Structures are given as structure tokens and as C-alpha cells.
Amino acid sequence: MSSPHQDSLLPRFAQGEEGHETTTKFPCLVCVDRVSHTVDIHLSDTKIAVRDSLQRRTQGGGGFHGLRIR
């Protein structure tokens, strides 16, 4: 039976409680807003969050700089 404060039928470890996020090499905290169902992601590693333009081009995510909409 679920505990009275548990909102889901998933076990506590599957809901991402404390300690679950810190098991990976790059722990990222994900917080879901119950009202608007948006996700707020906080990156703990600045190497992933901040890349220069050359790294973005070689690793993907460079965009379409030559694309024109007519």
C-alpha cells in the first residue's frame, strides 16, 4: 500500500527522490511544475552548459545559419 503523501503508484526510488539524481557521473536535477507541466533542468556541470561556437558545430546543435524564410 502507498504512503499517504505519495502522489504516484511508482515506488519512491522511481519518482526521483533524494539520492536518485546523484548516482550518475553528471547529476542533473529535474523539477516538474505540477500546474503548467513544464520541466526545469539544472545542469551541475558547466562543461556541458557552456560551449563555444566551434564545439557546438562539431558536436551538433549549430543551427541553420544559411536558412532564409521567404
Swiss-Prot record:
InterPro entries: DUF5431
Origin: domain of life: Bacteria
UniProtKB keywords: Plasmid
Region (Disordered): 1-21
Database matches in Pfam families: DUF5431
Protein name: Protein FlmC homolog
Organism: Escherichia coli
